[in-house]
């Protein structure tokens, strides 16, 4: 692809270092393409095309408030709720930054960057109220080793991705405390049962929670 890609990193030293040696500190065995630009200046970003929001969910509001957002298209890969309002990321962008829901999508799933960049098979779901936009992104991100599915359930995909983290942390504690496979299996299954109960509260499709962004990401 001949797309122009610019990645913002708030730490200017890290941004300049990555730009210079083409290595990410957490992905040192992978050389970053020269076609990818790095900056620590938000004014260098072009919000007229496609913007991928990948900062922590707790920082989205602060970062975007410093940006000159325009009528481009947006995709959120952050997982979680806004720390001040309790809003999901999509609701935050719509209510506080006037981003139209038909120009907004969520990408989520059990995706480890260190596996994706070396070509290991992975899958994700892209959710948007605008299915044409979701399919457009599906085509953009799909490859022979990265399978992308689409969904209209924007809220369900975000709820599954955020809430499953609580169970994932507890599952890790089971391992660390050596409580055994029985306890871990019981915790995960009962935890999923609690997550399922959110379908009514948020008016979401329970099948979404069993999908890639919920159960898939938990596993």
Regions found by a protein language model. Name each.
Residues 96-104, 121-169, 173-208:
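Internal alpha-helical scaffold of NAD(P)-dependent oxidoreductase catalytic cores
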Residues 10, 79, 129:
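Cofactor-binding loop segments of dinucleotide-utilizing enzymes, especially the Rossmann-like FAD-
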Residues 3-49, 61:
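Conserved N-terminal Rossmann-fold NAD(P) cofactor-binding segment
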Residues 7, 52-53, 126:
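Conserved SAM-binding loop
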Residues 203-219:
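C-terminal substrate-binding/catalytic lobe of Rossmann-fold NAD(P)-dependent oxidoreductases
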Residues 3, 72, 146:
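Short phosphate-binding/catalytic loops that engage adenosine nucleotides
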Residues 32-35, 39-121, 137:
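Rossmann-like NAD(P)(H) cofactor-binding subdomain of soluble oxidoreductases
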Residues 44-48, 163, 215:
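Alpha-helix C-terminal capping/helix-to-coil transition sites in glycosyltransferase folds
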């Amino acid at each position: 692809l001949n797309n122009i890609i610019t990645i913002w990193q708030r730490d200017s030293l890290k941004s300049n270092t990555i730009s210079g040696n083409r290595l990410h500190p957490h992905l040192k065995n992978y050389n970053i393409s020269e076609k990818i630009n790095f900056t620590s200046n938000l004014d260098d970003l072009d919000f007229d095309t496609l913007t991928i929001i990948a900062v922590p969910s707790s920082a989205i509001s602060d970062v975007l408030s410093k940006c000159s957002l325009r009528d481009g298209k947006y995709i959120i890969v952050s997982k979680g709720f806004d720390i001040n309002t309790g809003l999901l990321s999509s609701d935050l962008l719509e209510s506080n930054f006037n981003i139209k829901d038909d120009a907004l999508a969520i990408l989520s799933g059990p995706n480890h960057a260190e596996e994706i960049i070396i070509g290991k098979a992975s899958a994700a779901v892209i959710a948007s109220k605008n299915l044409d936009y979701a399919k457009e992104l599906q085509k953009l991100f799909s490859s022979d080793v990265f399978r992308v599915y689409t969904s209209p359930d924007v809220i369900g995909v975000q709820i599954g991705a955020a809430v499953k983290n609580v169970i994932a942390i507890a599952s890790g504690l089971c391992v660390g405390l050596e409580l055994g496979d029985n306890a871990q299996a019981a915790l995960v299954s009962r935890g999923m049962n609690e997550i399922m109960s959110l379908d009514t509260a948020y008016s979401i499709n329970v099948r979404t929670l069993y999908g890639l962004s919920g159960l898939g990401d938990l596993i």
